[in-house]
């Protein structure tokens, strides 16, 4: 049997209210796709039964895997372990893909694969779908990447602060994910940052299509990016940030200037996000955690990496001046209104 072109992994936890919409959009890819539905120990609704229903109805496309609750990261790990597709993409069960864009992307991947030029990383746009005001906002990369051709890290432009690669925008070759040795932490939110970040040094070729493929649903009260939820779960954000500090030696990338620069940019963003949500907490314990995070960065990176982050974008949220915290939170509120990221 021919290898599947792509594996979609859909971690599901009590997702019965919305997962069908997600799955139906993935089924539009037909037999060239493998869909792995990972039931993460759901007990409150019909998620396990829905996974089994689709696996029975589409036995050549859908696999249902039931696991003890391990969190979103273990759902992604489970997908990687079981994937047979050339490419691997995670789709959260409350999100979906645009079907027309998906067909276009897969047609291009088929063409590139037939030519023997399949890239390590395929990149597309993603769209924030805001439920609270029925608006949308597209994140695209036309200023960063060449379009509709193969390229490498030497060809990329400058990322704006609101323009990082996220899980929503990437399709990795499955082998790249295995080669980098990535294993996401269990019972931890925000591990999608590790998923995007850790494999980057293993990516040698890329392809960008200016298509709005991924639809990122935002606005559920219990969503992990909801501000109040993030404040409560800030320890998990800190755990992920420390993991990212440790998982790659950025000094080993000095010969790849643009790749190193982007990874510094991403790590700076993670430090800034951690700082902001600790500031929103506002407690003495949170201030101690903030100081400990910066001390961890200093102890686990070179002086050059630390200085780049501390005195660059990441350090903007850790101002050692009077009323620095108020200035940071004021800037955060302005950015929140402009970009509506949570």
Name the predicted role of every residue range.
Residues 88:
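Short aromatic/hydrophobic "clamp" motif used to bind/position activated sugar donors
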Residues 39-49:
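A conserved acidic beta->alpha catalytic loop
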Residues 72, 95-206, 214, 218-230:
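Donor-binding/catalytic cores of nucleotide-activated saccharide
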Residues 1-25:
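N-proximal low-complexity "stem/linker" segments adjacent to membrane-targeting elements
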Residues 279-342:
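Membrane-interface aromatic/basic loop that binds lipid-linked glycans or pyrophosphate carriers
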Residues 211-220, 226-254, 269-303:
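Catalytic core of nucleotide-sugar-dependent glycosyltransferases
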